[in-house]
Amino acid sequence: MAKLILIIVTQILLIAAVVSARKGENFAKTIDKKHFGLRKEKLTHFRVYWHDILSGSNPSSVVINPPISNSSFFGSVTVIDNRLTTEVAVNSTLVGQAQGIYAATGQRDASALMVMNFAFKTGKYNGSSIAILGRNAVLTKVREMPVIGGSGLFRFARGYVEARTMWFDQKSGDATVEYSCYVLHY
C-alpha cells in the first residue's frame, strides 16, 4: 500500500511540474516592431567633446576609490558628470552630460573600464541618451568602445564610439576627449 501511495504522489508531482513548466513558456512572445512605432533603422554620426575635470572647486569627476599603489592607477574608481560640448573649449556650447563611472583596470597598462551614458540636453535629441560600456586603452591614439543601448530617440541603439584625447594636464589629471559616435537606431 505504501508503494502505491508513493507511486501516485510521484505521478501527481510529475504532472504538476509539467503543467507548471508549460505556463512558464508564456512569459515572452515575439511582437512586431511596428507596435513600437519603429520605422527604418538609420545611422547617426555626431561628435562631442568630453571634459573630465578633476581639479578646482567644482570638479565634474571625483575619485571615490583611490588606486591601490602609487606606481599605477589600478583599482581607482571615478564617478563622472562631465560636460559634453560641440567644441574643444570647455565653455563651448553644452549639448549634454556624460554620467557614469570609469575604473582603472590595467595593472600593467593604462586602461579603464568605461561605463557611462551620454545624456543629451538640447535640440532634437533632448532627453535621449546612449549607453557606452567598454575598455578604454587610454594611451592609444584612437580608442574604440561599444554603444550598447539608448533611450528616447536612441531606443534600441547599437554602435561604437571612437575616443581621441585632445588635451591632457598631467598635473591635475584634467582632460578633453573627442568622442566620434556612430549609432544605429530607429
Swiss-Prot record:
**How is this protein named in the record?**
Dirigent protein 7
Location relative to the cell: Secreted, Extracellular space, Apoplast
**Coiled-coil regions in this chain?**
none
Q: Which GO terms describe its biological process?
A: phenylpropanoid biosynthetic process
Source domain of life: Eukaryota
Entry's InterPro entries?
Allene_oxi_cyc_Dirigent (IPR044859), Dirigent (IPR004265)
Coiled coil keyword on record: no
**PANTHER family to which the protein is assigned, alphabetical:** NUCLEOPORIN-RELATED
What lineage does UniProt assign to this protein's organism?
Eukaryota, Viridiplantae, Streptophyta, Embryophyta, Tracheophyta
UniProt keyword terms in alphabetical order: Apoplast, Glycoprotein, Secreted, Signal
A Pfam family recorded for this sequence? Dirigent
Tell me the function of this protein.
Dirigent proteins impart stereoselectivity on the phenoxy radical-coupling reaction, yielding optically active lignans from two molecules of coniferyl alcohol in the biosynthesis of lignans, flavonolignans, and alkaloids and thus plays a central role in plant secondary metabolism.
Q: Which family does it belong to?
A: Belongs to the plant dirigent protein family.
| Glycosylated residues (UniProt) | N70, N91, N126
> Per the record's keyword annotation, is Signal included, yes or no?
yes
Q: Which residues form the signal peptide?
A: 1-21
Where does the UniProt entry say this protein principally localizes? Answer: secreted
Can you list the GO cellular component terms from the UniProt entry? apoplast
